[in-house]
Amino acid sequence: LDDLRADRHQFALDLRRPLPPEPRAAGRLGTVFHDAVAQRLSARGTLFGLGQAGVPDSLGPQDRDRIERWLETAENLPLLEDYVLAETETDREITIGATTLRCRMDAVFHRLDGSGWLIVDWKTGRRQVPVDQLSVYVHAWAASQGVPTGSVRAAYVYVDYPGGRVDELTAAGLLDLDQIESALTPGSPPDEMTPLPAPEQQG
């Protein structure tokens, strides 16, 4: 929640998911990947080419190679072992205090034995995001399923790193609703905010 620490108002606006910024080449490639990985992971065990995954023929060879590498990274993630894809690009809303937040989750997986959930936010770039921002997703999903937050995992997955980089939200790093509400309360002076834990650094 670095953005929150710097500018509470802007952070609240970002959480409400305003209109996306103007598309750039990297952003368009990321969008293609998000669509393709949903197709690939929902068809595990099936031979699935880029065309079948919805990757447009208009992409150049370098971009197609990059998409394929990202998809292979996602498919081979140890994080996803024992999980099956449940939903992609799914929205959930949660009201915290006087603020209603809309969360769009890239992918949600269900553990095969039914014992828990895993939220994944795919990142095709390498700029790392503080993992405690996933706390809002965890609370929103847990509330929508009527399950405790302890049964919901969440992680950023950076697919551009060799083998993928996983930054998972730990139980200790999960912000509670009071902390999030305090952070979103307009007009609260910074010294009245509940202290926010620093994100845990993972290798």
Identify the residue ranges that each predicted region occupies:
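Generic recognition of stable, solvent-exposed alpha-helical segments in well-folded globular domains
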Residues: 24, 28-35, 62, 102-103, ...
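A non-catalytic, helix-rich entry segment at domain boundaries
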Residues: 16, 21-96
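Residue-level recognition of conserved beta-strand positions in structured domain cores
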Residues: 15, 121-122, 156
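A broad structural signal for short, well-ordered beta-strand segments within beta-sheet-rich domains
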Residues: 81-87, 106, 114, 148-152
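Non-catalytic protein-protein interaction segments used by genome-maintenance enzymes to assemble
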Residues: 91-144
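Anion-coordinating catalytic cores for phosphoryl-, nucleotidyl-, and glycosidic chemistry
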Residues: 1-25, 33, 42-48, 90-99, ...
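Short, solvent-exposed loop/turn segments at secondary-structure junctions
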Residues: 18, 125, 161-162
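Metal-dependent nuclease catalytic regions and adjoining charged, substrate-binding loops involved
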Residues: 67, 88-90, 141-203
